């Protein structure tokens, strides 16, 4: 039908225009609030004082001065505004009768009308008096709230009933199209919801996000309101603008009774929102354990696969270890990877649930996932690198004990000849030794082209120096440790770090570049003394045993305990004398 031929549509359009103009005028008045009022007269001050003190005889005398009724204070309050927020009905009637009708809709500087002030004050009789005198019941305050919405927020059934009897608009939208019905559902006031519906309230109203009162009741976990709305025609299958179902909202609220009720009336756990998330994802992320128990059996594996992420990811992201345990008990795979389109939405391109736990510094979730068999080496940016950079010793210890690759590389950040993880531990001996004790390839830190294994310096060709003055080809192809550690802003660490590294080697081939940097460090005399003397046979045997065992067994305490060796020797093989973190926790 052509909208030009629809009289109802024309009426609504005209009404909208009228309201828009009125709101613009009131907004401009409020903006100029301080300038629109003149200094108060003595009669006005006496009149206001009589209102506040409840002195009726004096008030009856002062209201004869009409000019005093038309004066407002610095807050924009006229005597009528003062009268509506005091409890004596007779005082309000006197002031109301003495005021011009044009003042009945005047707003304070805060944008409140006499009616909205009376409603906020919870004075039902004052509200009734204003309405009976003919005050318009639908004028919003400057926050966009109608008197009805304010009454619902106050939780006053009598106030709501009074407004309805005086023809207030039940479905009038407020800010973001939020209505009185939505607010009643949010507050869990079944009696007010029933009252609104009885007088023609719309159960299918949508707020600015497309959410119905049914969705609001589900989100806030009000099962009795939810059931009442369903019985009155609420659509269980309604979707919000973002595609969220009513069941999705209930999953966010976490009330298992609401979820059970929605499932009973046809709600589906397999309807994703526009982001692809299912109700089970929402419950797992929010940590709603009981809700999750309801959703696991009603959510299909195919729907989860299509979503691109598992509830395991959601629970880890939300740091909810109890939900993780429940999901693992129900057969969810801790090593399922995020879909590529989701992974690529993160700067680090994370893929595993374990990565979420590690990046959140969540020791408990990390422990739960690793105990369930999570592989710490599946992400493009290894979880160990993230934990070391965050300086989280316990997560680093957990990852290493469950097979994290201590010799991993992250080539997107820095193309180094040596394994990347040590970069983040150079200024922390506790972390550095934690990595070295667990098999870090320390020899790679001394592998470069600046000299041979006998310490003879390597002379670069003049052609290379001409092409890249001050640089060498190995810096371009893969940056050796000696180049990395001797840059001006890290040079102060070279002595301390090298002193730690040589505890884990048999022969240390110092190149000319590294040696020249060390010679000016205070650790150099000690380092030189160590290098000039042969290693102890005990230490050489330790290194040989570690190489024969392999990294995987070394990181598993149970494997070492099976060796036919006394505990003291086992501890020596594991470099326990250098386990500073374990000593702090009394683990060694």
UniProtKB/Swiss-Prot annotation:
Species per Swiss-Prot/TrEMBL record: Homo sapiens (Human)
Domain remark text: The SOCS box domain mediates the interaction with the Elongin BC complex, an adapter module in different E3 ubiquitin-protein ligase complexes.
Similarity section: Belongs to the ankyrin SOCS box (ASB) family.
InterPro entries named in the record: Ankyrin_rpt, Ankyrin_rpt-contain_sf, SOCS_box, SOCS_box-like_dom_sf
One annotated Gene Ontology cellular component of this protein: cytosol
Taxonomic superkingdom: Eukaryota
Protein name: Ankyrin repeat and SOCS box protein 15
Pfam families: Ank, Ank_2, Ank_3, SOCS_box
Listed pathway(s): Protein modification; protein ubiquitination
A biological-process GO annotation: protein ubiquitination
Residues in the signal sequence: none
Keyword check for Repeat: yes
Record function comment: May be a substrate-recognition component of a SCF-like ECS (Elongin-Cullin-SOCS-box protein) E3 ubiquitin-protein ligase complex which mediates the ubiquitination and subsequent proteasomal degradation of target proteins.
Domain SOCS box stretches: 524-579
ANK repeat feature ranges: 110-142, 143-174, 176-208, 209-241, 242-274, 307-339, 349-380, 381-413, 416-444
